[in-house]
Every structure is written in structure tokens, then in C-alpha cells.
């Protein structure tokens, strides 16, 4: 009920007292907040800024949401906006509100801080006696006559202020009362007095001793973490003298940090110090022997070479590759022979080559999958013999491969290309530059070009269908590449003889006019050939009966038996009727085609 009554009293102060209905800082209407220690009414925006100042400067409460005590109501009655502004800013013309304060939040905050926190607007000649009469000043005579009574009276007078100071953390009532008496109840100035009094007051010895012991304990804990402090007290003692911890203590303690263990092993020659206890770190489960050499890695695999491999072996590479090195340095006493490296070859199927090579190869342990080849019962040294053709029978190997034996490298010699034989056919033209491939091209008689003789250039007496087109066998030789030994005189016989059954086209243009109708417009006159006279063409045959086709100088089989000829097989180019050796009767076409396919006349 009292809270409700106090809320009504606060609202009456806002409505009845002039100036309280406006904000004390920005003069905005609609106040809903108040700073009860300053005795002013505020708007929402200015109340937010007052909260930023802290409770030691301004204590903000809501008019309707918070509860008000009687002392706080009396405080608001004594001050109000007009009286408070006269005290905090006695010269408003000298310190007016900035014009952009309503729009700029930072400008408004600076103005409020200068007014209440920094107190820049206070008049120097303004004294505390100009306070409202509701706060009577303390008289000197009364305070000197009865100090105990004045103290009790002051506590009763400043009960609200003392409770405020208690809320702010100032628990010494005597100091608080004395500060309030000096400032006539002004909490803000009393706080300043209390702060000044507390800073000038010397610290008690008991507090210093407890602080010193606390510092020693903290320093000892820090030194356990290997952090040295350089703090000295006035008596000359160092912090942590009672808690001296050496570095050996840290070393003797077990550690789980793999990097610290690595540093310890490095400093002690790759050996674990006796002080370090057994650790559960997975990085240091296996003991490390001092001065242990690093194991070599296996090629194309991860991890060291198995320790069972002891003796050394060498792999002799051919000198052609330019490699003469020991690739593997460890092997078992019982060596396993590898297959010797075979040179790459190109061309047809491989032929036995006769050369002798000695590879001294010692394979690593059979546990390595890359070197587990063959049986282990063979000897370490193998004289591999592969049949090369002997030098007496093959010109390619006159400078044959020499067996090197147990030397570090093999001497591969390329064949002497100058001794290369050229297979020249009697009819083929000779080419001195043909060293790599000798191919006999088909030869034609120079006196009988196009299969015709000089005496009979158009093959009047010789049948065209009986002409033979023959070619000499083609010889192709393969050339070796790389370091592979050249092949012996391998030749591929390619028979190319065949019977030509096609019609040999004449060398002239056969544009012929048949029955007054040209094949391609105005036909061209033949120069020397006369098919109707010399070749036995029948010009009375129609142009569209199947014998003659437009655009071709050739003839075809008749589509039907409309044209009847002699029916006898005669010389192909000398028939009175029927075209180009074709029988006039279609019943004999099958035998005629078979004869043509067999190359017979």
C-alpha cells in the first residue's frame, strides 16, 4: 500500500511542480524516469545516458515500474528539475545545450558527463549554502557541544544517504557519516571525500602480511610452471623463497608431451634420461638405442629395409645406359638369380641371338615381394646364353657382342651398317641411298607402256581382257631401333602378280554422237581412234538399249535379248555386232563372265 502511495506522490510531483514535466537535461516532454540521488526527472534517452555514468554519479529509477521509499520521495521534493539545474548549471547561457544534441547521441552524452560527472558547469563562487532550505546546514556550535549526540543525529538524518553508500560498497558508517556532514548530505561529494580519505589512509600491517603471503603462494605456483619472477619485497626477500622448486623436479616428473621428451632425448644423445618416468605416449613406446644409425628405405615402399639383410651385392648394368652403380646394399647369404634384362626389340618374331653376358645379381631377402623371383637353388652367377646368329653367316653381327664375364658393365656394339646388303631385283632400279628399306617396285616394260606394243598401240591383235599385269615380288626389310640388335636378313615376300580383267581406257576423249544426239552437248571429235571402223562397233544399235550408256565409253550387257548377234565367241575387239567382246545372246552370259573372271578368252 505504501508503494502505491509513493507512486501517486511521485506523479503529483511531476504534474504539480513546474519544470518537473520536462526532462532536466534536454527539456523533452513525457518524463517517465528519475534520478533520485540528483533529484531530477528524465526522459528515456537521458535516463539511458545517466545509467552509463554509473550509480556513484546517478541512480535512475522508473516512475511507474520501480518502488519508491519515503526518503527517496523526500529527496525528489527537496530538489526538482529547476533547483537541480540552478546548482549543476548556474549559467545556462554560458553552457547551453548543443544544437545537435537532440540528433547526435555522442554530443548529448558528452554534455551530461560534463554537467554531472566532470562538473564543468559549476560556478566557482557558488557555495553549498545555496542549497534548498529543506536541507538545513549543520551548525558548528551544536557539533562541538555534543559530538555523540550529533553523530547519532547525523545517522538519523542521513539514514537514506548511508544506505545508499552501503549499497555502493562503502561500509564504514563513521567515515560515511563524517563525509555526509561535511557535504551537507550530498552523496556525490561525500563519495569523493570517502575516496580521498581512503587513499590517504595507510594500510594496516596485518593486511600487508596477508598480501605478502598471498604473493609468495602465487609466485611459487608460477615458478612451478617454469616462469621466473623478478619481484623483491622491501625486506629483501624474494617471492617464493619458501617454495623453491628446481628444474630437476620438473624433469623427474612424468610428462605426456612428446615434444618435451624429444628435447630431453636430443640433449642427452638420443637416450632417455633416468629421471624421466615411463610415459604412455604412443610416440615413444619403443626404446631408442644411442648412436643407432638410420636404416635405409626400400624403393617404392614405406619403412626401413628389414634388418635380416646383411651382405652386399652389385647389379651390373650395361654400359650403353651409362649406369654403373650399386642399387641395393643388403641381401641374404643365399642369393637368388634374377632374369637378365632383355633389350627391347622391334619388328617380327624374335630370333635366337648368340651372345654371352654375365650378370652378377644378388637379390634381397625373399620377404620382399619385389625381389621374390624364381627358385633359390640357382647359382648367384649365371652365364645367360641367347642365340644370336653367328658372325660368319650374318653381316649384321660381324662385330658381334662380346661376353664381358664378371666385369662391371657389358659392351653392346651396334652393327656395322656399312656392311648392310641390299637385295636388288634385276628389274628394279638401283638406289645407292637405300640403306634402311629395300622394296622392289613393280616393273613395267618401257617398250610396252599401258600394256600395248609399238606395232599395235591400240591392242588390235591382243585381247584387252587377256592382258596380264605382273609385278615383281616386294621385299620389305625391317630396321632396328634403340639398342635392340638388328634383325637378320628378314624379308617379306609379297606376291603381287594378278590378272587384270578390266577394260583399259584409251587415252583419247570419246565424245561420240549417237543417232544425231550428243551425250554431253556438242561432242568432241576423236583424234585418232575410230571405234566403228577399227574396233567393230555397230552404230546401228540404239543408244538406250543397254549396250551404250551415256557418259561412258564402255559397254554393258544388254538388259534383254532384243538384240540378236552371232552368238559365237570371237575376238573381243573384232566383232561385227555385240559390244566389246560380249556375246549377242544373253543365254551365254554366264559362261562369258566365268571366262572373264578366269582370265581366259
Swiss-Prot record:
One GO CC term of this entry?
Answer: cell cortex of cell tip
Q: Which residues form the UBA domain?
A: 157-197
Record-linked SUPFAM superfamilies: ArfGap/RecO-like zinc finger, UBA-like
What name appears for this protein in its UniProt entry?
A: UBA domain-containing protein 3
Which parts of the sequence are annotated with region: Disordered?
A: 123-158, 289-310
Q: Which GO terms describe its biological process?
A: cell growth mode switching, monopolar to bipolar; endocytosis
* MF-aspect GO terms: GTPase activator activity; polyubiquitin modification-dependent protein binding
Q: Which CDD domains match?
A: ArfGap
